[in-house]
Amino acid sequence: MILNLIILLAISIVASASNIAAYWGQNAGGDQQTLGDYCSSSPASIIILSFLDGFPNLSLNFANQCSGTFSSGLAHCSQIGSDIKSCQQQGKTILLSLGGATGNYGFSSDSEAVQFAGTLWNKFGGGKDSERPFDDAIVDGFDFDIENKDQTGYAALATQLRKYFSTGTKSYYLSAAPQCPYPDESVGDLMSQVDLDFAFIQFYNNYCSLNQQFNWNSWSNYARGKSIKLYLGLPGSSSSAGSGFVGLSTVQRVVASIKGDSSFGGISIWDISSAENGGYLNQLYQALSGSGSPAAPSNSYQPNTPLTRTYGGSTATASAYISVGFTAGATHGSTTTNDLLAWIDSLFGSSQSSVQQYATPVQSVTATPQPVAATTTSAPKPTASAFNWFGWFDGTTTSTTLQTVYSTVPADQTVYVTLTTTVGSQMLQSLFDKRDVIAEAKSTNLQICWLLFIPLLALICS
């Protein structure tokens, strides 16, 4: 009865579209824990042991796990075997992955591959052998992570494994881990000739990653009419892949766009030790289950703490006020402090300006799923350096309009800011050169025509 419940649980897990499949064994995160630890603490429902990186002459590699050997030199991993059984009792599906990016593996012919199927079944499956690396633990299937572009024998191997599976007393699975370019150069024949259960597609280290030329449709078309489940393969951190790591907001956007695909099975991760760091794995699970949506951003922001920067002995201070509105279909614009009264005040201004006409805080409006009313925030008063006639003397009043700011809050929005600064005569750089925006300052320049205005002013005053 208990065995039947476990089998039913395993079947329901692999049929779900909210699965996390995680590779374990290569310590990509640098502090790999035991298999049992991850089964108990992580939301992963499928864990793939990596790797059986040598065959037909067997060689296992689990990085900092498993140091025992049989007399033949084959790895003897009793702890992993014990953990496999514990994981399976918790409803986890455990696969053994063949291949990897490095290793010494491959077949010279289909017949050699068919013969090797018996070795896999007897040493890791439901068969019998005097040297079983995981003792009496039986894996739930095999994964083909072939990356050497030699496709000889793998379709024959998988076909023969299916025959062995049919004699077993539980469900077994076959999977592949293709690179995202379709068709894959190493397992393309296998995937076209054999019915597989899962494809853990590596959408990283290639041009077809999520933030580039994402090609899910190519794989979805391949899966049409098949029972295979496609997994969105991601690196667990920026250090666990050469390229292709993306933030949670990108994953959420992509998952939302493909979750309705009947072939979508979930997310696969390389690898679990790196994805556990910082809680990324749990965030991915929440994104899949629908509970990981970011909180709606506030529609107004208080000004940043004034920033003070010094260049060439001159000091400048500025505060940025942001007002964001979310109104579908509207437009956006910006204004700066540059009216007539402000100009007149700058001619005879003291260190504190008394002008009451100031720029309206900039409002940016853009479409979002949940519109809210736009708000405004009072802008700070502009200041001007003392006795600043036409920019002839010590200071120059500069009005700076920032370019578009793309907010880091997890929503699709565009924010515009208006920034008013008072700068010294030697102030040449933007106050915000280290920020996530680019400011272009345009200072008031002395025009030669003003020289004609001085005699006229003297005549009027006399």
Curated annotation (Swiss-Prot):
Its EC number is 3.2.1.14. It catalyses: Random endo-hydrolysis of N-acetyl-beta-D-glucosaminide (1->4)-beta-linkages in chitin and chitodextrins. Residues 18-291 form the GH18 domain. Pfam families: Glyco_hydro_18 (PF00704). InterPro entries: Cts1-like, Glyco_hydro18_cat, Glyco_hydro_18_chit_AS, Glycoside_hydrolase_SF, Glycosyl_Hydrlase18_Chitinase. Its main location: secreted. GO terms for biological process: chitin catabolic process; polysaccharide catabolic process; septum digestion after cytokinesis. Residues 1-17 form the signal peptide. This is Chitinase 1. It comes from Candida albicans (Yeast). The lineage of its organism: Eukaryota, Fungi, Dikarya, Ascomycota, Saccharomycotina. The gene is CHT1.
